[in-house]
């Protein structure tokens, strides 16, 4: 979550203003296999090869890959890309939330994560990454089977792995939607396409937190007053590809979004460190973070603290933030106490510091976020 010296040099080079990219150039260079990367806020995007893109990832540089979304983003009015700070009421649905979180099961989450981490990897361009997205869609469709007012579908991309979206219509279908997100993909930075990448914590934990939250809400017969969605994104590790595609689509189609919360890594804290919920400090909405502080205090056993800034495009919440949506991201630990083995074959549940009891608290947060903001 920190930029290296090499990353700072890359960002400096990107801060050169240029005219908008013409469609002919965009399509021609994309057809050659080049990728258009947005490396910094208010900087012009730059073209990189896939190998150069991978080197940026290895250097710890975060970015949006906007190759597929650049044209759509140019059509969205700039006035729509920033919203005033939002305010959210204090938690008031304790009876409902407490009843539902009592049904959350770490055994269910562990079973789901076992399946997900058994894929060789969930890289967005690999066949097993595509298989993982199929498994997620099949799983959530099974959960909502026979339930009215709830649907599940794929959001297709130009690469092999689709994103998955579950929608609760809500009683007032015209109201703004509340969204919870996680990313389904994983990566081994040494060998992305074929390397072993169980991605147990990054982001298997967030993925199964949301699957279990969905199961608990459906089993409880919860019907939101306003629309509620669960998103599992493809291609986060490749430059927030899936979330940016979905967010751009929603912005371009005028879909109103009340709030977005990302769960990206919820299962680890460094042995000997204080167990906390760490709220990301940048590219978030202060009002939503204040609401989450109350949620954590009301519904979990953990103290809440602020993390240090994670930087530009560090996870899927950034995709929504740039379209003016109130966003937040509760994280597993303060940076430095988080999982050091991500993006490798060692991101498994067997490492010291991984805790299902810890991850369960984030599923509680997800239930509370969903119920409190849609009731």
How would you label these PLM feature ranges?
Residues 269-375:
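Active-site-adjacent substrate-binding region
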Residues 111-169:
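A non-catalytic alpha/beta surface segment that caps or lines the substrate-entry region
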Residues 69-126:
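N-terminal hydrophobic or amphipathic helices/low-complexity stretches enriched
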């Amino acid at each position: 979550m920190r930029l290296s010296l090499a990353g700072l040099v890359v960002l400096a080079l990107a801060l050169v203003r240029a005219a908008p990219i013409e469609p002919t150039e965009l399509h021609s260079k994309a057809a050659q296999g080049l990728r258009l990367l947005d490396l910094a806020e208010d900087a012009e995007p730059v073209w990189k090869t896939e190998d150069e893109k991978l080197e940026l990832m290895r250097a710890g540089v975060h970015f949006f890959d906007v190759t597929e979304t650049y044209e759509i983003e140019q059509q969205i009015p700039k006035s729509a890309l920033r919203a005033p700070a939002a305010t959210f009421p204090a938690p008031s649905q304790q009876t409902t939330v407490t009843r539902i979180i009592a049904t959350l099961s770490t055994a269910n989450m562990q079973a789901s994560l076992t399946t997900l981490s058994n894929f060789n990897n969930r890289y967005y361009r690999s066949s097993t990454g595509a298989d993982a997205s199929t498994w997620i869609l099949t799983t959530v469709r099974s959960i909502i089977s026979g339930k009215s007012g709830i649907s599940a579908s794929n959001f297709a991309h130009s690469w092999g792995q689709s994103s998955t979206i579950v929608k609760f219509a809500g009683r007032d279908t015209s109201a703004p939607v509340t969204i919870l997100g996680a990313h389904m993909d994983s990566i081994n930075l040494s060998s992305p396409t074929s390397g072993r990448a169980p991605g147990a914590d990054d982001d298997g934990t967030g993925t199964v937190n949301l699957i279990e939250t969905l199961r608990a809400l459906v089993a409880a017969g919860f019907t939101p007053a306003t629309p509620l969605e669960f998103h599992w994104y493809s291609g986060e590790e490749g430059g927030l590809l899936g979330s940016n595609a979905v967010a751009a689509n929603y912005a371009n189609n005028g879909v109103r979004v009340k709030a977005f919360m990302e769960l990206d890594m919820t299962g680890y804290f460094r042995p000997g460190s204080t167990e906390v919920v760490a709220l990301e400090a940048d590219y978030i909405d202060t009002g939503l973070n204040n609401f989450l502080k109350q949620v954590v205090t009301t519904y979990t056993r953990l103290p809440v603290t602020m993390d240090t800034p994670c930087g530009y495009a560090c996870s899927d919440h950034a995709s929504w933030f740039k379209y003016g949506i109130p966003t937040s991201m509760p994280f597993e630990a303060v940076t430095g106490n988080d999982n050091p083995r991500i993006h490798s074959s060692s991101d498994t549940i067997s490492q010291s510091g991984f805790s299902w009891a810890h991850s369960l608290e984030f599923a509680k947060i997800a239930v509370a976020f969903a119920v409190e903001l849609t009731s």
